[in-house]
């Protein structure tokens, strides 16, 4: 049974569709306006999209799809996807799992909760992986773990810096221990990347939690958090119910983690691409000066 874990899909045959930011409707579908979840401001959708899905009044960052994230991060036309042939199977024959995967494939136009590929950012080559919370809450199952691992291995073999945008609700319960195993698997791969001397920049977006936080997302050489992102292992509601104590203001938000030394910087969505380019430029200068 396990030998077929990364085989061709035996159950779901929904054809993958190209899913770009230009084709995707703004939040609210056919509506012209969106209400900000934080300040309740009514925002014209066109204005919201032009502002990279950030509320112009309070700065609240709406969640992005993986392809929208790619579109605002990498150089246009530079993306070469790999790993799209890895299909989700149902190793535990969990009731309803095949149907749920099929539903999310149709809903998101994606095969899984992550996209991996090679691209450039301001001309600097990278291996990039972007998770998508819209696909089963960004949960990490065996395919997500395998694609992250292959992205790491691609970075090692090509000696290109690795950039991973994380957003996840935790391990995928429908795959049981096989999903939990991905924490150790991806962490071991990051260790090999580290030994090879390859730069790894981890970007945590809202929300990043569970097994993803406890593995590769927290192992970057440089860890960037998007402004206002929830970053946690167990969420604040679970912790509050467990210890019956009122939590500090902003607990587990990006800014709180920065104050406590858990991330290196907190950036708005508008700043991330430029900051990545600066990091890559400095890294390239360092490699050249060392004869790399």
UniProtKB/Swiss-Prot annotation:
Residue ranges of domain CoA carboxyltransferase N-terminal in the record: 32-292
Database matches in PROSITE patterns: COA_CT_NTER (PS50980)
Protein name: Acetyl-coenzyme A carboxylase carboxyl transferase subunit beta
Highest taxon of source: Bacteria
Gene3D superfamilies reported for this sequence: 2-enoyl-CoA Hydratase, Chain A, domain 1
Quaternary context: Acetyl-CoA carboxylase is a heterohexamer composed of biotin carboxyl carrier protein (AccB), biotin carboxylase (AccC) and two subunits each of ACCase subunit alpha (AccA) and ACCase subunit beta (AccD).
NCBIfam families registered for this protein in UniProt: accD
GO molecular function: acetyl-CoA carboxylase activity; ATP binding; carboxyl- or carbamoyltransferase activity; zinc ion binding
Note on how the cofactor is bound: Binds 1 zinc ion per subunit.
A Gene Ontology biological process term: malonyl-CoA biosynthetic process
Entry annotated with the keyword Metal-binding: yes
Catalysed reaction, written as an equation: N(6)-carboxybiotinyl-L-lysyl-[protein] + acetyl-CoA = N(6)-biotinyl-L-lysyl-[protein] + malonyl-CoA
UniProt: Zn(2+) binding residues: 36, 39, 55, 58
